[in-house]
Amino acid sequence: MNKFTNLLIKRTASSLKGGDFRELFRKNYIPITQFEKVLLSVTSCVEGLKNPTDSNSVACITELTSNRALRRLQILMNSTPDGRRIIKNRPLIDSSKYSIKDLMAFPDDSLGRRYGEFLTTYNLEINRDPVRYVNSEDLAYVLTRFRQIHDILHTAFELNITVESEVTLKLFEFLHAGIPFGAIGAFMGLFITPILKVRPKEIFENHNKTHVYPSKPIQIHQDCDKYLNSLEITKKEILYPKRIVIKELIPWIYKAEKKMRHNIYTIMVEDWFPRPIADFQNYLNISPPPKQLQKYTRIKPMPFC
């Protein structure tokens, strides 16, 4: 059991650094037996159900359930010139290639600049969790690429990091890449998507940021209770995330994925960093959610999101 416990290594985004993927694979790969794989899968699923925001469990489940999907995605990537270049050269979108400062140096409204703004807005790092339990170096790279594209999808679709946006994007990743955990994550995410959110329509500056656990069915933000109580009803914004996800966002992302001209995993998105994000969206034939949904999904500093 000591060996099994050691497998549940707490991941940090900073552990995926360096420019050579082979070196990263050798550094991070953990060989496990079939029995350990089953045990780790069950444990990760239980932990994931208890806390769907636990990135360690999510990463484990993805790696242990995606082998066939990764092979299909690898075949798809090899079917296009850009995809073959990606598979051959194994480029990384991480801190060994780009800093936030580098991204912010791209022109206004470029994909790279908007990506940097997204990371800055939510205080995110560019590095992603390393792949540990995929025993094929080639497939481990495909999963690494999949993870590194995630925040670029947020940027391209203009989706924030609320539970409702993450559920929407997980479903997209399942439809677009076939990764099983996309469907599992979207399903689990529906259970922790709040039924109700209450916040002031105008976000005021002098607030105290507090964490609101995302599985609370009704989110009334504690740091602005007095402020909300002093507002007239017309100045309060009441949101219904769970209903919107089921009735609006899921149908929208399903249609959006079906009408895309190209698969994003077959594209050297780095080549688009200096170009306008609108050109990238037009090339893929994607667009942000409809205007009436953007109060749920818009990318902006939202202390009460």
Curated annotation (Swiss-Prot):
Its EC number is 4.1.1.130. It catalyses: a 4-hydroxy-3-methoxy-5-(all-trans-polyprenyl)benzoate + H(+) = a 2-methoxy-6-(all-trans-polyprenyl)phenol + CO2. Keywords: Lyase, Membrane, Metal-binding, Mitochondrion, Mitochondrion inner membrane, Ubiquinone biosynthesis, Zinc. InterPro entries: Coq4, Coq4_euk. The keyword Isomerase does not apply. GO terms for biological process: ubiquinone biosynthetic process. One of its GO terms (cellular component) is extrinsic component of mitochondrial inner membrane. It is a peripheral membrane protein. It holds the Pfam family Coq4. Pathway: Cofactor biosynthesis; ubiquinone biosynthesis. Zn(2+) binds at H150, D151, H154, E166. It is found in: Mitochondrion inner membrane. Its cofactor is Zn(2+). This protein may be expected to contain an N-terminal transit peptide but none has been predicted. Lyase that catalyzes the C1-decarboxylation of 4-hydroxy-3-methoxy-5-(all-trans-polyprenyl)benzoic acid into 2-methoxy-6-(all-trans-polyprenyl)phenol during ubiquinone biosynthesis. Belongs to the COQ4 family. Component of a multi-subunit COQ enzyme complex. This is Ubiquinone biosynthesis protein COQ4 homolog, mitochondrial.
